[in-house]
Amino acid sequence: MTRANHASGTDRLAEVVEQRGWKEDAIVVNVQGDEPLMPVANIQRVAAMLNETAGADMATLMEPLDPADANQQSVVKVVASETGRALYFSRSAIPFRREGGVPALLFRHIGLYAYRAGFLSTFVGWPPAAAEQSESLEQLRALAHDAYIQIELAPEAVPAGIDTESDLAAVRALLGAEQ
């Protein structure tokens, strides 16, 4: 078990890596607990992305976001560069559309990360960033310290995550239907 007072799931994962004594170059994948239906192909892809991308400290995935969900704070949005480098994550609709309305192309961040074990040691040495605390998004600590987060479209759609009571009910219903 891990300590109960970690600032984030990434901090908790770093404790596990330290306890297990994993090598610095080991690739560690963290599937967020609120994404219980994560497709195996996505888990495999995020690990492969980190392995294939020179200089990347982390890798993660995104998927197109229904504009109707743009203003839901429980849905994390992401903006990425043309080369697949994550630029910012937010609970607000980003990028902002100056003309009003919802941006035409939005992406939802998927709660799945791959790290090199050595990077996790570096990450926990950084204090939480102001943006991380404001948005309650741990990946913003990495960006605040110029970490390179590689991101691409998920190979498979991610079924409903669990961010609200209604999400939990939907996942329970789905799992009950599969039994």
Language model regions located:
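Structural signal for conserved beta-strand scaffold positions within catalytic alpha/beta enzyme cores
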Residues: 1-3, 30, 60-61, 88, ...
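Short phosphate-binding loop-to-helix
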Residues: 1-31, 35-48
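A short acidic, often aromatic-flanked loop/helix-cap motif at beta-alpha or helix-coil junctions
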Residues: 5-10, 66-67, 157-160
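Short beta-strand-to-turn element immediately C-terminal to the catalytic PLP-Schiff-base lysine
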Residues: 16-19, 79-81, 162-163
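Short, high-confidence coil segments that cap the C-terminus of an alpha-helix
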Residues: 24-25, 53-56, 147
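Conserved core of the sugar-phosphate nucleotidyltransferase
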Residues: 38-129
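Conserved alpha/beta core of the MobA/IspD/sugar-nucleotide pyrophosphorylase nucleotidyltransferase superfamily
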Residues: 103-179
